[in-house]
Amino acid sequence: MDSPINEINRIRNDRKCVLRSNEFLNRYMLEIDNKDLTTTSYVFSVPIFNITDGNLVNLKFSQENGCLHHTGSNADIIVRNNVVCLKNSCGIVHIEISKSEKEIGSNNMSMVNLSPTLNGVKLRKVINKEKFIKLNIDINETPYGIKFNEKYFSFMSHDITPIFTISVIGDRYIESFTPGSVVLNTKAIDDRHYEIYIECSDELKTVEVECNMYEQKLMLDTTVENRRPDENNLYGASAIIGSGEKYGEQWLFSKINYGIIRNILLKRIKSVRLFIPRLNKKVTEITAYNLMRRFCSIGTTWNNNDSRSTNTAKTVFTDSYYIIDITGFTVDSETQNFIEMLGFVLKPKCDGNSYSLISTGDCYDQPQILEITYYN
């Protein structure tokens, strides 16, 4: 995503849409008045406005004194030589990229390409013969703890809230991305210093990694998979939806954090659609199922999930998105008021060796977008 406004223009196929004034400064939301006297809110899964000055995050580096600078939604980011520094009120994190890489910069010719996200950086690296990336990370104060698996690593401020997360995305430039192609391994040096090794399979030509300071998210979600039935991907920025003999079946559970849209909760709602970015070319048909019971994004795994459902939602796809119409999950058909959704689960429609790589609610480079159209 190069700009939240440009992304909305692309979704609407409208280069001249006029934004409504953000009176309440909902940091996640852009609004547009429609010709039929309705208003559409585009709510991003992470904040798009800076917490201090209220300005829209500018997804471009500036240069000063030989460094790259970026101001995210609640963090300041500085890139000096091969070190990225991310700083906010919760902590200061340094990421040192292996010095064996000869070029580090913000242009596509570099071996390591860095670009700003909404609250951090995305690292894209051309895969070398060693087939791995090494990152040294440290934090200025001992964190409450850490959480990690083969998909992400997080410094935690307490049990469920990260300070900072590194998450592997994969290779967006190959036709079919499979689970297991990218693995994140962690080695502790001490309680503030860690080595991160991101190992890549032979099929990958490049790999992408997101490094972000945490913000509260709109979509509370996690993937579950039968290959690792006691794990989930709570803080990972990408999800793989699909099924296959070698890597098993993978689903995505999700629900709305209603506190983030409290300024429009009392409106009469016309429609609610969720735009989930597609991160690779492969299309796997998916279905959204409305859950009968509330799920916990923190503790849900393949072994303990309850995916019983009441109805399904229409899902279509474009070149950039899966679009899920969840109006029936979230709106009372008679009163047109919001009803609390217990959650939904995305599952592949058919069995077979097919996987799609998509963004989760923790993605700061290609965030999910909730489109809510309401009557004035």
Predicted regions: what is each one?
Residues 108-111, 120-122, 240-241, 255-259, ...:
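Short structured motifs
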Residues 127, 139, 245, 276-280, ...:
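Non-cytosolic beta-sheet module surface loops
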Residues 135-140, 150, 254-256, 265-281, ...:
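A short beta-strand element within beta-rich, extracytoplasmic domains
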Residues 194-261, 293-296, 348-351, 355, ...:
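Flexible, small-residue-rich N-terminal segments that precede or flank a structured functional core
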